[in-house]
Amino acid sequence: MLSPEAGRLRPEYTERIGNTMSRKDLQQTIEQEPLRPGLEANLSRIKEIGGGTSDLLINPVRVSGIPCVLLCCEGMLSTATITELVLHPLMKLHLPDATGPRLLEHINDEMLLSVDRPVPLTFGDVFRTINSGFAVLLADGANHALAFGVQGYDKRGIDEPSSEGNVMGAHEGFTEVVRTNMSLIRRRMKSPVLVQQLFVMGEKSRTDLCLCYMSDRVSPRLLEQIRQDLEHMQLETILSSGYVRPFLERRDWRIFHTTGTTERPDVLCSKLLEGRVALLIDGTPFAIFLPKLFVENFQTLDDYTCKPYYAVFVRWIKYLAFFLALLLPGIYTAIALHHPELLNSTLLQLLTEAEANAPFSLMTESIGVLLMYEVIREAGIRLPKAVGGAVSIVAGLIIGDAAVSSGFISTPLLTVTALSVTTGFVIPELSHEITVFRFLFILCGGLWGLFGISLLGMVMLLNLCATEAYGYPITAPLAPFAPRAMRDVLTRIGLRRMQTGNPRRHPTKHAWRLCTVSAGIFSAISHRNSLQYASIPASFLCNLSKNLLAHLPHKPCGMPPALWRNCMNKIRSGQLFAICFLIRSFSLLCTDIPFSAVQLGGAVLSATLQGLILLPILLTAGIEPSKPASCLFGAFFLLWGGHCFLQLWGVAAGVTFPVHNKLFGALLLTGVCLYGVQLGIHALARSASLLLPLFGVALAVLLLGAWSKAQPENLYAAAGGSLLSAAWKDLCECGWLPGAAYLCRFTPFRPRRAVYGALLAQLGATVLVSLLGIAVLGRVGAQVEFPFFTLGAFSQPFATQRADAIYVVLFTLIGTITIAVQLYLAGACIARLFPKFPYPFYAGGAGTLLVAWGMHSLGLLHSGLFGVWILLLCGILPVGQQLWGQLRKRRMA
């Protein structure tokens, strides 16, 4: 038991510290205090600083008649090595007319006693070398010392990694000694371009860290940023890799890690070959590498030691396991409580009978079962291995069997929980994220059904898409999309095809470089031997920073720095097209029009009229927007955001919706949209590009379920009214105007034909896809009682009673992106008009809700006509401004 005096300083330091310096100042003084010429003075000072520590060995010796002292730390060096390599040669040394400085100089220059021979100059250097396993020689009359590297402390041998098992790979793992780990890497990578730099971190622990990289492949910018982060890291002690990772990940709001850890030397060598940077830390067997992509959580070493078809099968199993582990309990709770129509009658009856005798609600029951599992798992981990496994098995069997037998827990719920927990073991790198968000999905599913699960899923997706590691998005190569790198993401091609051609152009191992989206420099890094193929053509990129936010101060008041940095970036044309397509799809999903040949012709005519309206905006997109134009654009985006809210809740009125209070549901949706806005335009753009294929697959499944019940002649049936009336109605719906206006706002001021061509191509593709959807799928929409694709009472793709909840998920995901885009642009217009306003985006969200409430109160459900006039004015104003400027110049002339 420690005494009350255990944590206090020694008495000889109390007065000095209390009068002149703090503990930190004392540490700095010791580090900087130089050695003295007298041996007795140095020895007494060392004893004073050491405070009588028992493991400091002081051995007085005489070398060539000079009084010397050999200092070492017990247990940190090899006794046989120091006796044979240091003491015996020193005892045999006879140097005539020897002095202390000359003796140390002769030993250092003429005698090879050890390979590593640092020269301590201060008392801090002496203690640092002694504690690192060196033997330090002090000589009388010398104001410096000489150290010999004779380390020989006990260490764990090289063993098989415990956290990363494999079948056909190597069975060597890192140890706790950094120099041993360096040798494991060097033995596999004998290239001269492999650089391993040692440095010391930690004010108290003085831990050795090793920075590893391939000098011909690493990005100089990435390497410099990592070095700066390590230099700014102020830690007293470093005991594991978990101490360093937060400083390399920079932000705490990220859900997923941007740095990876591995216990395997072969895995780390493959990362170094990809141009990554690795960090070895003394005292831990886990090496850090960065940056890390999200898809790497589903890749293992065994994927490259088996046939490609089996690797693809296993990889898809991992993707499926991730979604099951994360979503299965929440979806089960949501369906059982809010969407029982998704189940067929037999399954619904079984679940009803199982839950009939349960004393708690299903949400409480689900959370209780998961909490019980987490307690048992934690107990099994913390207990000794001989007892932990037995305790886990016994506790699981006894508690689980007793709970089911007594009726506290239903059998289906226990089955769902066991399946979710088991699938979570397939992806151990994501175990922490899965564990926490599994509970959150249960809460959201129990409170708001699949609507709540969709909102929480959007929060995770937006956070994932906004996460970058030193400018590299971790969602690459999915967003931004890189076709070459996709060959080893969802599939896995053969190794012969991977290594065909230039080995530096590895399709997947360099996916993070192919998809570089540097923070502020999109063309990124063009190094002579690294990342020269990562440059992305800039002709198809649309610049946001030089448009609406052109005259904002460098860092607007109230605008988060992350948002400002994202505003100054560029987004890719494919992501822009995904946003426009989802906006158009949302408008089409919510359109309550009986589609027919007349309606198809009306849509074509309406698209032509809208193109004429947008023509002035396209022609004047390179002109700096004036404040009146920004005000009109802001009004349009607020109006359209409110209209999207009304469309969403109009759809909700026709399907089974778990949130009955529209205002509360709108507040939830607005909160998620504002979160996406705060993360920046890149988060929205990447999320849209990831949602687009998901939306296509879901829509195909739903339409296949309804296709057999549709009559093809409905497409040619008259819907009532003339072609002009159909065009007028479609024009009032403002079909693709939001996407077109959004494209125009991202046009750079410096006009480029390639940029205008990309804009027109995206507009044409969006309109063409929409019209083809009407023409091909219109026969399905002609028979439904709800809006076009809302086939809740019509489609039964999985033999369900009704499929309303699936449409709720689709509408929520697409509606979140659509409304978030409008809020972002409305907030940007507000920031343009009022640069000193602290919360422009929150004002945009509140304004959108007020507009939606006002339109609902006034019955203005089709407000697109107002948007037409506003956009028309937005095109006329710059033209008038330009003409007025030319007239003034002529008058001045």
Language model features with spans:
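Hydrophobic transmembrane alpha-helices that form the core helical bundles
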Residues: G622-P658, Q678, T812-F834
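Membrane-interface interhelical connector segments
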Residues: L337-E355, V776-D804
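Generic detector of multi-pass transmembrane helix bundles and their immediately adjacent loops
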Residues: I331, L347, P359-S523
